[in-house]
């Protein structure tokens, strides 16, 4: 990791500039501009089909935009050669919606997989790091010998988080981290996301439809609309009440919604938006 003493927390780790993505003739993202300062957690919310997951994958170099550029630590992800990109992706951690664990491996080998792919370490070191990460996400040591199919959905999510953090990444991306979980387990995952941020200076992107998660873990929230241009500062709500680029009526509704004063479902906000446009 880079030395935090030499870098300002206000320096963007990720800087997306006018990125657009098309699939065939369909516009998925249109001129998206956003920055993610070091150490902050950004939540991306929006209705189904608005491009949340596409935006997330573009920010980490998994989808190449048709226009625009994504800067990571002041370097253009899409101008890196394959070796440079591979080294940069080591600095990312991914927590997938379905945990994406390898069924052919036990939990120990699932969590150890990134170490064996990217580092040279002896088995004693690997074991110590894996067991420490499992403990940090609240899993007992006996889980290490189990297969993913033997675990509950919440336990698999925690294994996915342990694996994502095993290399101490600078950027962690969470794709719908609480989908399919009951409220109690959702709160556990949210607390683990916060605990990760407290343990070391990590920057995070959380794609979610869960307003409780957005309120709990994020410093900043982006409301993404289908095929709408997003300028710096626009559709971004700071929970301290800072102004946004939304018009006043819509701004109030979005703020209320994110704070939980207008309900917990995105379709409620969608109905509000439709009434504003009618």
Language-model regions, residue ranges each:
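Catalytic Walker B motif of ABC-type/P-loop ATPase nucleotide-binding domains
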Residues: 172-175
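Conserved ABC ATPase signature
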Residues: 147-151, 155
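Conserved catalytic motifs of ABC-family nucleotide-binding domains
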Residues: 168
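Conserved ABC ATPase "signature" region
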Residues: 75-76, 123-142
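Conserved ABC transporter NBD signature motif
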Residues: 68-76
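Helix-to-loop junction immediately C-terminal to a conserved catalytic motif
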Residues: 60
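Short coil-to-helix segment of the ABC ATPase nucleotide-binding domain corresponding to the Q-loop/switch region
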Residues: 105-113
